[in-house]
């Protein structure tokens, strides 16, 4: 159990360091970008967040704007990589909306690194669930430019 806690702590420390050094101006690093959004790692390196969006993030009546959902997914993927000590940029983001994400209802996002195709290309996956049902599934490709010092 101590090893798992140490692993989670390692991911959290890496994320905090990378956010300060490479991501300080990101709107998702300021509080509150989305009210209550707080990412945490599990011992396997998956990033998990729980939050709610109110009317200020609404698109169609009663639904969270799809662009807000995509931005949250993008931020979670970037921060998941930072927790793995990787600074990379979004090259491709594919978002599949399976059902509406409703306002004023708890939302859970889980993001994981699927694979690394090289030291410069990373594949990630995110799932957003609401009421224990999958609402949004996304995949992303992130590229680490050769010019970034990590």
Model-identified regions with their sequence ranges:
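Hydrophobic beta-strand-centered segment that forms part of the acyl-chain substrate-binding groove
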Residues: 75-113, 142
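A conserved, well-ordered hydrophobic junction motif at loop->secondary-structure transitions
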Residues: 48-72
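Non-catalytic linker/capping segments at the edges of enzyme domains
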Residues: 1-55
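Hydrophobic residues in beta-strands and at strand termini
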Residues: 51-53, 97, 144
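Short beta-strand micro-motifs enriched in acidic
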Residues: 40-42, 112-116
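Beta-strand secondary-structure signal
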Residues: 48-50, 94, 108-110, 123-125, ...
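HotDog/MaoC-like acyl-thioester-processing domains
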Residues: 1-16, 101-103, 114-150
């Amino acid at each position: 159990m101590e090893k798992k806690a140490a692993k989670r702590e390692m991911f959290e420390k890496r994320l905090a360091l990378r956010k300060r050094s490479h991501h300080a101006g990101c709107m998702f690093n300021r509080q509150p970008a989305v009210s209550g959004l707080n990412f945490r790692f599990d011992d396997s390196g998956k990033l998990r967040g729980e939050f709610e969006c109110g009317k200020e993030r609404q698109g169609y009546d009663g639904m969270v704007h799809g662009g807000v959902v995509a931005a949250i997914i993008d931020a979670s993927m970037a921060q998941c990589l930072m927790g793995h000590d990787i600074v990379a940029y979004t090259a491709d983001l594919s978002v599949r909306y399976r059902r509406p994400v409703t306002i004023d209802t708890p939302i859970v996002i889980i993001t994981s690194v699927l694979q690394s195709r090289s030291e410069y290309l990373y594949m990630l996956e995110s799932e957003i669930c609401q009421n224990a049902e999958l609402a949004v599934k996304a995949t992303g490709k992130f590229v680490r430019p050769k010019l970034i010092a990590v």
